[in-house]
């Protein structure tokens, strides 16, 4: 009995030890099952959070793509509206300039016809004055002729009476009284001779010769015929000039009425275009407000995406560290406790290195862009200097046929972010210089107009100076139209270049959107596949350790 009891005691001790070890193993197994349940819960939560994050990322990417497409469409519409508006303004400016040129030409023709009318009026007044003077002279000559004819008739009657008296005396007296008769006749003849001499002296005092008395009647008739003929000819010329003036005045009035109608139509078209421009500006303002709202939403979504990425990265790092600790804890009994920890550390260092390289790449691109902008600004400054020197040379030469161009202030960069303090000060000095040049040009124009006014006063006294002034005015009008056409052509070329640049930008953005859209679609499909695989792994509780390590390695490469 003692021997059997001695044999049973070590067996009982061994059974007790085995039961204790079994209890310890059961406790350890329960703890491991609890840890496994916790890890499965964590993996389920990780898969759920990953699906949520992936869905949020997909939605945010889709929203970003939609917003970018809408922005591109808005930019295209605004560019089209701007091009249409600029084309309409260009056409309206051309029509206004042509109408103004036609109106100025009509005004010049009207002024010319008014000057001709004034000259014809002055000539008519001079002809009327000459006619009145000739009529007065004719009346004076006629009165003198009548007085002389009356005196001549009286003298003829007296001579007849004397001759009759002499004949009577000769018939009544005889030959014996010849001496007394001859003496009386001599006395009468001397008296008659004295009377004739007195009459001749009186006629010579009036500057009329006796032999001219016979031709006065013929000259009077000839003068009357000439005066009447000149009056008829002058009257015909006056009637013809009146008819020509009336026809020209009627033509000018018709052309002015037509020009007024065209001007009203142009004003109506301008009002319509202004109304359209107001509507388009309202649409543009609304689109700009929508663009600002979308930009704000985009920035907000980008911030949310950045926060989610950071949260996802931190949670992934924490989960990887937990998994590494768990794997190291389970593998510590096998003598390989630092392998998983080392792998996870290497993976995190690779992720940090990739982020650091991306940041360095972006910083290098920003530096390169800044360097390119500085080079462009330097080239622009050198071009401005060359343009200023060439313009000053043209202004110093004094050649009026060559247009020196606008001041250099029109070609300066107005963006303050691209300019330094020295550049801003130079721009301010260029503005002051341009303002002073415009003031000098205005003063020269005023002086030229005053000189032209004084010259116009002198032109009224001479036709040659008037023609020169008209030629100068036509030359100035041609220069004005030429300058306006050059400005419009320059503006048109600038608009075309801007349109080409905008088209290139739209094409680049479209290519960028297409490429990234395809890449995002591929990434979304890949993430969905990965999410499906991760869910299957989370459901299977007896997954081997090699598959877990491969999944972690794949996730590290994806990050």
From Swiss-Prot:
Summed up, the tissue specificity of this protein is: Restricted to multiciliated cells.
- Top-rank taxon: Eukaryota
Encoded by which gene?
ccdc78
Q: Which residues form a coiled coil?
A: 9-327, 419-541
Q: Which family does it belong to?
A: Belongs to the CCDC78 family.
* InterPro entries, per the entry: CCDC78 (IPR039873), DUF4472 (IPR029329)
Point to the regions of Basic and acidic residues compositional bias. Answer: 1-19
What turns on expression? Highly up-regulated in the ciliated epithelia of embryonic skin during the developmental window of centriole biogenesis. Expression is probably activated by mcidas/mcin.
Q: Any keyword Cytoplasm?
A: yes
Q: Protein name, please?
A: Coiled-coil domain-containing protein 78
Q: What is the recorded function of this protein according to its Swiss-Prot or TrEMBL entry? A: Component of the deuterosome, a structure that promotes de novo centriole amplification in multiciliated cells that can generate more than 100 centrioles. Deuterosome-mediated centriole amplification occurs in terminally differentiated multiciliated cells (G1/0) and not in S phase. Essential for centriole amplification and is required for cep152 localization to the deuterosome.
State the GO CC annotations. Answer: centriole; cytoplasm; deuterosome
What's a BP term from Gene Ontology annotated to this protein?
de novo centriole assembly involved in multi-ciliated epithelial cell differentiation
Which residues lie within the region annotated Disordered?
A: 1-20
Q: Which residues cross the membrane?
A: none
Localisation per UniProt entry:
Cytoplasm, Cytoskeleton, Microtubule organizing center, Centrosome, Centriole
Keyword vocabulary terms for this entry: Cilium biogenesis/degradation, Coiled coil, Cytoplasm, Cytoskeleton
Keyword flag Translocase: no
What Pfam families does the database record attribute to this sequence?
DUF4472
Name the species this protein comes from.
Xenopus laevis (African clawed frog)
């Amino acid at each position: 009995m003692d021997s059997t009891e001695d044999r049973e005691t070590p067996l009982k001790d061994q059974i007790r030890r085995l039961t204790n070890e079994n209890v310890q193993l059961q406790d350890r197994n329960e703890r491991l099952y609890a840890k496994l349940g916790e890890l499965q819960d964590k993996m389920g939560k990780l898969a759920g959070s990953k699906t949520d994050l992936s869905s949020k990322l997909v939605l945010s990417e889709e929203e970003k793509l939609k917003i970018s497409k809408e922005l591109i469409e808005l930019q295209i519409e605004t560019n089209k509206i701007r091009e249409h508006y600029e084309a309409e303004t260009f056409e309206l400016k051309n029509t206004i300039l042509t109408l103004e040129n036609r109106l100025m030409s009509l005004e010049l023709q009207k002024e010319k016809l008014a000057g001709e009318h004034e000259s014809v009026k002055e000539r008519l007044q001079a002809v009327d004055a000459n006619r009145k003077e000739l009529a007065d002279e004719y009346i004076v000559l006629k009165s003198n002729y009548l007085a002389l004819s009356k005196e001549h008739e009286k003298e003829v009657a007296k001579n007849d009476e004397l001759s009759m008296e002499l004949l009577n005396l000769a018939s009544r007296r005889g030959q014996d009284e010849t001496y007394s008769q001859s003496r009386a006749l001599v006395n009468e003849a001397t008296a008659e001779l004295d009377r004739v001499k007195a009459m001749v002296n009186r006629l010579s005092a009036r500057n009329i010769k006796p032999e001219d008395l016979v031709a006065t009647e013929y000259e009077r008739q000839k003068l009357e015929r000439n005066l009447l003929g000149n009056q008829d000819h002058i009257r015909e010329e006056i009637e013809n000039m009146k008819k020509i003036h009336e026809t020209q005045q009627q033509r000018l009035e018709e052309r002015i009425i037509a020009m007024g109608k065209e001007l009203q139509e142009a004003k109506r078209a301008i009002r319509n275009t202004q109304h359209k421009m107001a509507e388009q500006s309202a649409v543009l303002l609304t689109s700009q407000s929508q663009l600002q709202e979308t930009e704000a939403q985009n920035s907000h979504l980008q911030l949310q995406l950045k926060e989610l990425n950071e949260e996802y990265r931190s949670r992934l790092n924490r989960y990887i560290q937990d998994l590494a600790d768990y794997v190291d804890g389970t593998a510590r009994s096998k003598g390989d406790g630092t392998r998983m920890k080392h792998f996870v550390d290497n993976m995190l260092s690779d992720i940090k290195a990739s982020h650091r390289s991306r940041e360095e790449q972006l910083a290098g691109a920003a530096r390169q862009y800044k360097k390119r902008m500085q080079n462009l600004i330097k080239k622009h400054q050198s071009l401005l200097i060359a343009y200023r020197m060439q313009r000053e040379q043209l202004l110093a030469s004094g050649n009026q046929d060559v247009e020196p161009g606008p001041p250099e202030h029109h070609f300066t960069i107005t963006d303050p972010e691209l300019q330094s303090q020295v550049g801003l000060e130079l721009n301010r000095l260029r503005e002051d210089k341009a303002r002073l040049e415009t003031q000098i040009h205005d003063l020269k124009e005023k002086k030229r107009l005053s000189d032209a006014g004084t010259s116009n006063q002198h032109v009224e006294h001479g036709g040659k100076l008037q023609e020169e002034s008209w030629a100068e005015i036509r030359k100035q009008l041609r220069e004005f139209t030429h300058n306006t056409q050059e400005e419009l052509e320059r503006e048109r070329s600038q608009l075309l270049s801007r349109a080409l640049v905008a088209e290139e930008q739209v094409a680049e953005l479209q290519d960028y959107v297409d490429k990234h859209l395809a890449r995002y679609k591929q990434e979304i499909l890949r993430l969905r596949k990965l999410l499906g695989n991760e869910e299957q792994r989370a459901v299977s509780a007896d997954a081997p350790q090699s598959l877990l390590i491969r999944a972690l390695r794949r996730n590290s490469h994806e990050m």
